[in-house]
């Protein structure tokens, strides 16, 4: 059977899709690119915003257009909370929520895929407490890229921020033990990957049900031979302790790159969101990072148009973010999520105003990122060069292909503090680290 998959949403989803495809390939199936004709299409979905859900529907319809006779399996967060709706989309064969998506290889082996409702009961049609009972945790990692791997170390969340449906889609916080996680990390090292990105829904809560700590996991990972770099994909500000900051600053392999969600620069709005910090604590965390890692890259999530936010509070957010040593923003436009407490909060912001606020935050992000890049010019930073296809940059065109020997192509890499770098392609450098002086000629001004 030929299988193609499309992943929407977070790095956690990418790790899960990759692991699923690896298991399906081990069963003798052939994995093809998403835009190829396939016998089976898998859509791993996201429910974080209404826009994300729209993209999920579009992906399902695209698969059906590519091969109307193909079977389509929809998995993930949107599948967990909206199975009855998804089942009505033409072409959908099976809907598996987060609690049973790991069963797909077994379903295919047992030739049960034709039975439309064989696992749809796993996804609650509405957001209820029963959907919080996601039963087991599986350590998973992405495997397509030998340079950089996304490693799922934690799942679920206990925070129940008023705007967020993810705890209903993924359950409460759960993880493996440190020993089990380190064992999987050694397997990743054996695969040849040099950089590992630790992913989860709320990574800082790792190990709580085992009376273990995230910091102790970091210490164990730092001792694993073969892995040269680790990044923490995201950590809540109230969980980013001084001990974690100090450890990262002096560790062997953890990089000066943090993603610290903010969401708003107004204490009143943060309270409405049920965030577990205020602006004073958030500023203190960033100052602590910069005190020991002055060149660290710090990214932040920010939300535009949350219910009840006034224009004055939005302006306060702009001014607050502008005053922080933030390198760039991930901007989300608020949308109502069924079953969340935010539906009952304050006056709804008109959609055009939400989009205007989003645009202003994106402009601020661009300015902050340019300033961060400018602060790094002339400095020497270690770059991990990526394997993979050669890319054309700096104005080269496809029409010049007859003039394009390998030396006209470039390879890409990331500095330790998350700046995108390019250089003329050299196969010998792939998956190695090289110290590079940063200039306007070798920096690509992109965020990923």
Place the predicted regions along the sequence by residue:
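Cofactor-cradling patches in redox/metallo enzymes
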Residues: 1-112
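Radical SAM enzyme [4Fe-4S]-AdoMet core and its adjacent flexible, acidic
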Residues: 10, 207-226, 273-276, 336-367
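Generic structural signal for well-ordered alpha-helices
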Residues: 60, 185, 218, 245, ...
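Conserved SAM/AdoMet-binding glycine-rich loop
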Residues: 72-73, 81-82, 190-311
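N-terminal [4Fe-4S]-dependent radical SAM core
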Residues: 108-150, 441
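Canonical Radical SAM [4Fe-4S] cluster-binding loop centered on the CxxxCxxC motif
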Residues: 144-179
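Conserved alpha-helical substructure of the radical SAM core
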Residues: 168-197
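Terminal RNA-binding accessory module
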Residues: 344-402, 406-448
């Amino acid at each position: 059977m030929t299988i193609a998959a499309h992943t929407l949403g977070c790095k956690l989803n990418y790790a899960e899709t990759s692991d699923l495809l690896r298991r399906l390939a081990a069963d003798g199936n052939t994995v093809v690119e998403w835009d190829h004709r396939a016998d089976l299409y898998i859509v791993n979905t996201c429910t974080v915003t209404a826009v994300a859900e729209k993209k999920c529907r579009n992906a399902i319809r695209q698969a059906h257009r590519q091969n109307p006779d193909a079977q389509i399996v929809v998995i993930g967060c949107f599948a967990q909370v909206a199975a009855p709706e998804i089942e009505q989309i033409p072409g959908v064969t099976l809907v598996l929520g987060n609690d049973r998506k790991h069963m797909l290889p077994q379903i295919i082996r047992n030739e049960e895929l034709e039975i439309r409702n064989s696992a749809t009961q796993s996804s609650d049609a509405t957001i209820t407490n029963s959907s919080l009972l996601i039963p087991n945790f599986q350590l998973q990692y992405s495997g397509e890229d030998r340079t950089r791997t996304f490693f799922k170390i934690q799942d679920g969340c206990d925070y129940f921020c008023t705007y967020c449906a993810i705890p209903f889609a993924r359950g409460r916080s759960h993880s493996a033990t440190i020993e089990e996680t380190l064992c999987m990390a050694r397997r990743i090292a054996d695969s040849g990957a040099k950089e590992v990105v630790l992913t989860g829904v709320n990574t800082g809560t790792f190990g709580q049900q085992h009376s273990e700590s995230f910091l102790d996991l970091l210490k164990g990972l730092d001792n694993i031979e073969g892995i040269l770099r680790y990044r923490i994909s995201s950590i809540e500000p109230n969980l980013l302790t001084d001990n974690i900051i100090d450890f990262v600053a002096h560790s062997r392999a953890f990089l000066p790159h943090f993603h610290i969600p903010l969401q708003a620069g107004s204490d009143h709005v943060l309270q409405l969101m049920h965030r577990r910090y205020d602006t004073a604590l958030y500023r203190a965390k960033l100052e602590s990072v910069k005190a020991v890692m002055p060149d660290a890259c710090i990214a932040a999530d920010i939300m535009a148009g949350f219910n009840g936010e006034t224009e004055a509070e939005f302006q306060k957010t702009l001014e607050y973010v502008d005053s922080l040593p933030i390198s760039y923003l991930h901007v989300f436009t608020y949308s109502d999520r069924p079953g969340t407490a935010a539906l009952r909060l304050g006056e709804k912001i008109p959609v055009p105003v939400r989009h205007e606020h989003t645009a202003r935050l994106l402009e601020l992000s661009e300015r902050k990122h340019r300033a961060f890049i400018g602060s790094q010019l002339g400095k020497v930073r270690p770059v991990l060069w990526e394997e993979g296809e050669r890319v054309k940059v700096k104005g080269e065109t496809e029409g010049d292909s007859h003039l394009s020997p390998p030396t006209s192509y470039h390879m890409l890499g990331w500095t330790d503090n998350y700046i995108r770098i390019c250089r003329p392609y050299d196969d010998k450098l792939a998956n190695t680290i090289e110290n590079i002086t940063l200039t306007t000629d070798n920096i690509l001004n992109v965020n990923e």
